[in-house]
Each structure stands twice: as structure tokens, then as C-alpha cells.
């Protein structure tokens, strides 16, 4: 048994089964106040549809801010946002930093490699010390599933926590920006067929997307990938599972491609990247099997020639770069909702 950065033995998500779709540490809904308001954003799982729609509606208001000469609103003026990235992600950290800055917050990016956790201090000791510096909001990315929940349970009452990705478990703001992108282009969730393709087993994005899609009433969600890269429990969520890409893509309105997360794999689950592309890569020919107006999405980073062809990634049906743009507005909305009305 090992001791993790929390200072406790085992994993913060000790009851989680990495091969299953659901995680065992999700007991109750610690994200909501007694009045049903959003205090933390830890997972899309368990969020009422009304809150998800409220976030998307608020994000729509913030999209116009990016087009203004002065790209700032005073919603978080005087608030301190700490970006705590225990796992690297330049793209996600940067968009959170931009979002907080546009809300007029003071932003601190903690250099984890130089922090006390690398000197043996526990995660909770680090959080308690940062809370003593009058932080208002922690944006947390961690390699251990459940770490943001642990922080939310133990941080000071006035502090809010946003999960920026924890292990295989969840990436709620990516899921929300994906939903915003789909709504922007397709409007009505209740008439869509959405395909998620690739390494779903290791993907926190896939889990967040599936919870969001089912919450918003999408009638048909498809999971497409090799048997070795699909978790159990998908069918219980109402997801249709396909082990043939061509069959799975027929008639879909939205395609969400996922990269191979080799850093989370143990053992040889797949042949070479070239063989993977041959069987599972999205090419123009395969895209033609989808609905004529289908859109192509990808949470990034992309591996061209592995899960997606460059002609598709750069083609007219790709909305991948717009996902990045919308992501700033969605993260502004989340931060504004959880921390904007705090005393």
C-alpha cells in the first residue's frame, strides 16, 4: 500500500473501479448548497439539468465579452483565484487564467514542482496553507481521481473548488464547453445522435460528456472504440456501444474524437499508432457516413494521423478551434456562478 499526496494511505478514490463508468466516492452531492446553488463544480454527474442550462446560458452572455475592445467585467474584482495544477496542462490552465482575468480576479498560478508537495507536505496541508492566504477559489487538476472532492470537503467554508480534471474521473468544464459547442451549432439536444470515439476507458472528458449529454436529454449517445478501451457500465447509462467505427458513425450529428491516453495505460492495449489509425482514425471517407451537417469535435491535444486525419481536423465540419474559444466563456460562467455572489 502506498501513501499519496493527501497524507493518507491509498487513493482518494479508493472505492473507484477504473474499468467501470461510475465512481464510488460520489456520495450525495457536495457541489450544491442546502439551497441547491452551485458551491463547487466537481463533476457533471448529479447536477440538475437546470444548473447545467444556467451555466450554458451564462456562458452565452460572456461570449460577447471576447469581442469587445475591453475584455473585462468586474464580477470577481477583489477575489483571489489559485490555479493548482498538480498535473500539467498548458491549454486548460491558460484558459482558466484568461477567464479569471477577464472577470477581474487576482490570479495565482502555483508552481507545483517547486511547491511544498514535492518536499513531502500533504495535499491537505498545502490547501490549508493556501486557504490561510485568503484564497477564494481553487482550480484543481490532479492525477488522482477524487482529489478535488477531498479538497472541497476540507477547505475553508468560504473557498470554492472547480475540478479542472482528476485522474480518469471527470473534467466538468470540458464537458460543459463541449455542450455549449453542440448547442451553438445544433440548438436542440433532444433530436441528436452523438458519437464519442476512441479511448473512452481512460478519458475523464468522455465521462463528463456522457453525463452531460444524458442530463440534457440527448436520445442517442454512442460509444465507439476497441473493446480494450471501453469501460463497463456504459449500457446501464443508456449508451449504445459499437466496436466498428463505420457502423457507429452512420447518421450521427456530432462526432467527439478522443486521443489515446498512453500515459494512463498499463500494458499493451493496442497495436501500433498506424494500425490504430487504419481501424479507428476519422478520415474524410468515414466522416461521409455521418449526417451531411455533422460537426467534428476534439478536446485536445490532437494526434493527427492517429485518431484524426488532418483533412478532417482542418476541414469545414471541424469546430475544434471554436471549442477552445467557447471554453473561456464557459469557464468564466462557472467561476462567476460559484464565486461571484459570495460574501
UniProtKB/Swiss-Prot annotation:
Pathway: Pyrimidine metabolism; UMP biosynthesis via de novo pathway; (S)-dihydroorotate from bicarbonate: step 2/3. L-aspartate binds at residues 119, 204, 259. Its EC number is 2.1.3.2. It is an enzyme of class 2 (transferase). Keywords: Pyrimidine biosynthesis, Transferase. Residues 1-20 are annotated as: Disordered. GO terms for cellular component: cytosol. Carbamoyl phosphate binds at residues 91-92, 141, 171, 174, 300-301. Gene3D superfamilies: Aspartate/ornithine carbamoyltransferase. One of its GO terms (biological process) is 'de novo' pyrimidine nucleobase biosynthetic process. Pfam families: OTCace, OTCace_N. Residues 1-14 have a biased composition (Polar residues). GO terms for molecular function: amino acid binding; aspartate carbamoyltransferase activity. It catalyses: carbamoyl phosphate + L-aspartate = N-carbamoyl-L-aspartate + phosphate + H(+). Heterododecamer (2C3:3R2) of six catalytic PyrB chains organized as two trimers (C3), and six regulatory PyrI chains organized as three dimers (R2). NCBIfam families: asp_carb_tr, PRK00856.1. Catalyzes the condensation of carbamoyl phosphate and aspartate to form carbamoyl aspartate and inorganic phosphate, the committed step in the de novo pyrimidine nucleotide biosynthesis pathway. Belongs to the aspartate/ornithine carbamoyltransferase superfamily. ATCase family. This is Aspartate carbamoyltransferase catalytic subunit. It comes from Burkholderia lata (strain ATCC 17760 / DSM 23089 / LMG 22485 / NCIMB 9086 / R18194 / 383). The gene is pyrB.
